[in-house]
């Protein structure tokens, strides 16, 4: 091979390598996202509607889920990469070997999670629910806290209250109005909408019993193969959280538009009131890790349905590095 031919081959190889790098850099990052239909999904909705993800170079394919555990199951099926779920299904998933990791705290949602009855009901507190039917989503942190903390605080045992499974929050209000159930565990925006329409009233909320963290999780596959996509997602998501905390009225307006697109005519003030009941604290703090350990121990004890075999290795299940990177300078 002559020097001339060798130089030509080297030049061609460099062109191919550079072309591959440039092509990879020009292709947008992509994730498949599960968006919660309750307020835990608001940052995602805002980031999508305001174009925050696109501005981070991220292409998002998204779908709605009524429960965090439904999104978790979609992760298991390989259908989505990012999803937020409550601590109970998160821990149960870890126990079952679901390959995912928590990278942030979506929210603390106890203030928006309520026990509601019909507006004309003669039930005024949880102690009056003995022998009654309370619509609840099974296999969730709401069920776990209701059975393990709320009922005992009123001297009631889990078996003394019927808890028919109504997974989708939007179906619990019709069941309540039709008197198929006597009460329901319900979260916003459905509580705020039901109050506004004069259909229900609140008799208790969950903050007296538990702060109810919601965990933001990603599959281990995307964590390994596309960490930059996860960071881009977190940057867009954090911008939405910032809007919620610093410009709540504007954030409420964006989410009100989303509700209108779903056929729900709700005043901005109603949505604003509901959103202010949420707490947005993204960091996985030592207190959150301790909370997860304590709840895992309770689930191992197996006092209610949904128990787990062992306390999972949370050191492997929690990743704080990507959120730190997303918060940092580019």
Q: Predicted segment positions?
A:
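Secondary-structure end/capping motifs
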Residues: 224-306
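Bacterial N-terminal signal peptides
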Residues: 9-19
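Short amphipathic alpha-helical segments at helix boundaries and their inter-helical linkers
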Residues: 80, 177, 278-290, 322-330
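Short, glycine-/small- and polar/acidic-enriched structural segments
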Residues: 25-159, 163-166, 172-175, 182-188, ...
